[in-house]
Design a protein with these regions (language model features):
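Cytochrome P450
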Residues: 2-449
């Protein structure tokens, strides 16, 4: 089983850079500083809109062009012509996430707040005065991270797999007799939140509403704020219920923590946990299945065993990572990153997909399959995804794929992979809109979808 890199162990070793190209820190290593590259505002360059179809249709080419024109750090503009930086270099992302003092998660220091309207579509992703773990720094952040990790560590992986198998069978029973279905809409998008609802203590019937709210929120469009409100209200209600009647679930364990967190703080952290877990896990399932159904290296072994599932999942975290770009850090003072002058208060985004494609570490794409876990898909540094959360996501995704292949052994893509598949319109998350498949109709196993 492929396991995510242990954040408490030694740092992962990146693939060897190409010796024919200078490393990102070599420019200006001796002699005078050559100054920022042409894309920096110091040269009057304009920002690249973080939107458009190319983030869905050809992200590899897009990031290559951005790197060619601007280097490891590119100026971008967000909705409303709000300036920011996108870090595309592998080592620069590592540097950014390794210094929580210079590059802080305290969004209060942002120098653009006076330009942000209250109904800004990206508001749910860039919070101001939100008491969640995302924007907490220092010792308080470490205490909150410990609270979350301690609660998630109590999730029994054997029981988690059992719940995932049961819910997977129920969902597959809903379409297995039809001979064709959309794996995204009827399986991948429904399964993770069912499991999360179970381990967090939600009633099963609330899962569909959570799916809709999460999709609205993370796509960052006109319904983003409504999705955020629904999710926040759901978590506040859940915390109140568990405060009154504790159960055997993650929420009750968080409330039992002795570090003195308020119910509102716990509710805010639950929003972060569910939003960070559901959609990326659903996309991990969908993207891995797409790879297995379209790539001969994996398609040939669909019915021949499970050995390729872990390889496909690992490769997806390099090639089609569910989180493309992430709202990242704010510079606490003037500094330089990748040769660009970053002003105090500037917003700096983590270009996770761009860093994965960095030619300084990607001399041969085939070298990144197998057991290389040095990707940034789970983040890095103090604000990385907690290791227990990584394990939970992997158990859910791998079990979902294995159960589907067991139940539908001759599953095949029902459309042309070049023309029949489209990606969701989001520069943040990479996932398919649909994954139409066909298979030999099979009987139900007794589940109720």
């Amino acid at each position: 089983m492929t396991t995510p890199t242990d954040p408490d162990g030694p740092e992962p070793e990146a693939p060897e850079p190409d010796p024919s190209e200078p490393g990102p820190s070599e420019a200006g290593a001796s002699g005078p500083d050559p100054g920022p590259p042409p894309g920096c505002p110091a040269h009057g360059g304009s920002g690249i809109p973080l939107s458009g179809t190319r983030f869905q249709t050809e992200p590899t080419s897009l990031y290559r062009e951005m790197r060619r024109d601007h280097g490891a750090v590119a100026p971008i503009v967000l909705d409303g012509d709000i300036p920011a930086w996108l870090v595309l270099g592998y080592r620069e992302v590592h540097q950014l996430t390794s210094d929580p003092v210079l590059f802080t998660r305290d969004s209060e220091v942002w120098n653009q707040w006076d330009r942000i309207p209250e109904d800004w579509p990206l508001g749910p992703m860039i919070g101001r005065k939100q008491p969640s773990i995302l924007y907490t720094v220092g010792e308080r952040h470490r205490e909150r991270a410990a609270m979350i990790s301690d609660a998630l560590e109590e999730v029994d992986p054997i029981l988690l797999r059992h719940h995932t198998e049961r819910f997977a069978d129920e969902l597959i029973d809903g379409f297995c007799a039809e001979g064709r279905t959309d794996i995204i809409g009827r399986y991948a998008m429904l399964l993770p939140v069912r499991i999360l609802a179970k381990i967090f203590g939600f009633p099963d019937e609330q899962a569909p509403g959570l799916v809709t709210a999460l999709n609205d929120m993370v796509d960052g469009r006109e319904r983003a704020l409504a999705g955020q409100r629904h999710l926040g209200e759901s978590m506040t209600g859940l915390v109140a219920e568990k405060r009154a009647v504790p159960g055997i679930d993650v929420t009750s364990l968080m409330l039992d923590n002795t570090a003195g967190f308020t119910d509102q703080e716990v509710a805010e952290d639950l929003v972060v946990m569910v939003a960070s877990a559901h959609q990326p896990t659903a996309d991990w399932i969908g993207n891995s299945l797409r790879l297995m159904l379209t790539d001969d290296r994996f398609a040939a072994s669909l019915s021949g065993g499970r050995h390729s599932v872990a390889e496909a999942m690992n490769e997806v975290l390099w090639e089609d990572t569910p989180v493309q770009n992430a709202i990242g850090r704010w510079a606490s003072r003037d500094t330089s990153l990748g040769g660009c002058l970053i002003k105090a208060g500037d917003l700096v985004l983590l270009g996770i997909a761009g860093a994965n494609y960095d030619p300084q570490i990607r001399t041969d794409s085939s070298a990144l399959t197998g057991g290389n876990n040095a990707f940034f898909s789970f983040g890095h540094g103090e604000h990385r995804c907690p290791f227990p959360a990584q394990e939970i996501a992997e158990v859910i995704a791998r079990t979902a794929i294995e159960v589907l292949l067991d139940r539908l052994p001759d599953i095949d893509l029902a459309v042309s992979p070049d023309e029949g598949l489209s990606w969701r319109p989001s520069p943040w998350l990479r996932g398919l809109v649909e994954l139409p498949v066909r298979f030999t109709a099979t009987p139900v196993v007794g589940g109720t979808p």
